[in-house]
Amino acid sequence: MATEVQFACALVVLLGCGYAGTPTPSKSTLIYNSQNCTTYPSIENGQSSLYYNGSWFIRYEFNCSSGYELQGWPYTTCIFWPKNGTIWTNGPPSCVKLNITTTLMPTSTSTTPVTTGTFPDPQNTTHPTHHTVKPTRRPINLLRFGYTPWAIITLVVIILLVVWIVNCCMGPMF
């Protein structure tokens, strides 16, 4: 079943001069050339939706019915070529039936006999030995609170420097 399309494809050309051949909108003239699109065939076991945005394009989008898979492009657009007239960008897709096969696994109704015998007593079972890790000692170069002597010396120097700057530049505070 084919549907007659009542819309037109448009070729829009901007004329004008610009840097490196780019069109200049202020000096451009709009030339509108339209041709009727040919009828686009419908697809078997699928649907198509027609989209038209005023003057830029006409587009069909396709999807397949449940149980079918789309083979080909999911859309096609009508465009105008000066030498060829209007053409659709892609050929019609097709909807191919999905091959869903299920494999039944054989089931067994037989039962496995229970093994009788002796099993180890959980109370008397030996467990792997755990090795205790001795805590590591602080390196010798760290002091009581975990700081190196250089960190404490640097901190004292910074405090003395700040006190000297305050007293020198701002005068005695007392």
Swiss-Prot record:
Residues 108-127 have a biased composition (Low complexity). It is found in: Host membrane. One of its GO terms (cellular component) is membrane. Disulfide bonds join C37-C78, C64-C95. It is a single-pass membrane protein. CDD domains: CCP. The chain crosses the membrane at residues 145-165. Residues 35-97 form the Sushi domain. InterPro entries: Sushi/SCR/CCP_sf (IPR035976), Sushi_SCR_CCP_dom (IPR000436). Its main location: host cell. The keyword Transmembrane applies. Gene3D superfamilies: Complement Module, domain 1 (2.10.70.10). Residues 108-133 are annotated as: Disordered. Keywords: Disulfide bond, Host membrane, Membrane, Signal, Sushi, Transmembrane, Transmembrane helix. Residues 1-20 form the signal peptide. It comes from the Viruses. This is SUSHI domain-containing protein E3. It comes from Equine herpesvirus 2 (strain 86/87).
